[in-house]
Curated annotation (Swiss-Prot):
Its EC number is 1.5.1.2. The gene is PYCR3. Oxidoreductase that catalyzes the last step in proline biosynthesis, which corresponds to the reduction of pyrroline-5-carboxylate (P5C) to L-proline using NAD(P)H. Proline is synthesized from either glutamate or ornithine; both are converted to P5C, and then to proline via pyrroline-5-carboxylate reductases (PYCRs). PYCR3 is exclusively linked to the biosynthesis of proline from ornithine. The keyword Acetylation applies. Keywords: Acetylation, Amino-acid biosynthesis, Cytoplasm, NADP, Oxidoreductase, Proline biosynthesis. It catalyses: L-proline + NADP(+) = (S)-1-pyrroline-5-carboxylate + NADPH + 2 H(+); L-proline + NAD(+) = (S)-1-pyrroline-5-carboxylate + NADH + 2 H(+). Homodecamer; composed of 5 homodimers. Belongs to the pyrroline-5-carboxylate reductase family. Coiled coil: none annotated. This is Pyrroline-5-carboxylate reductase 3. GO terms for biological process: L-proline biosynthetic process. It comes from Macaca fascicularis (Crab-eating macaque). SUPFAM superfamilies: 6-phosphogluconate dehydrogenase C-terminal domain-like (SSF48179), NAD(P)-binding Rossmann-fold domains (SSF51735).
Amino acid sequence: MAAAGSATRRVGFVGAGRMAGAIAQGLIRAGKVEAQRIVASAPTDRNLCHFQALGCQTTHSNQEVLQSCLLVIFATKPHILPAVVAEVAPVVTAEHILVSVAAGVSLSTLEELLPPNTRVLRVLPNLPCVVQEGAIVMARGRHVGSSETKLLQHLLEACGRCEEVPEAYVDIHTGLSGSGVAFVCAFSEALAEGAIKMGMPSSLAHRIAAQTLLGTAKMLLHEGQHPAQLRSDVCTPGGTTIYGLHALEQGGLRAATMSAVEAATCRARELSRK
């Protein structure tokens, strides 16, 4: 479907938590979908308040969302998603495109719960979607074509960078980018605390640390450089940076970070098998 067509499409959300709200807000801010053409459901009004403030329609009926919208994003907790999908299955049609953002629930599980040939995709966003700077991957089910994939990618680019991947990469993305937000925060905190130790005020140190991460990330993305090249560019013989990098290597930063991604990925795979 052409990009222009997505502006008039109705988008539904089953589940109205923080991630659902972030995606909806991104769609609205980017002009991808008009607020009044978004319908969200949740058991209580607590989470729906954010959608109502955005100008979206809300309901307590999950089936009503599917009866109103052909593109529906399931943003419930993973452990209740199978029950929710089974609940709405009677109103699913061949026209629906269903998207799950729940970690640990496979495409095959979703397809088994839905009518034959239902078009299903998995999307794994991360927390920076809240500020429209998310890292998002999506994997398509057996009955999804390139047009549906392009439509969803076009919409989700309102929330950050969106890449299509094989489903096998989804758990790795959880370890790299979902959990990676916490890893980066831990490094940012340590970076700032090093400056605090040397005498810089706390608030200033944390602002500069965050800005350093932001600026570095933009250089890596916009210039397409490998991190090793940028790291080398910053180093001068006998300078401050190479001394600092030596200290990081002595502390095992590189190995510890790789192990963190591995551990988080293995845990994601373990949860997927339950």
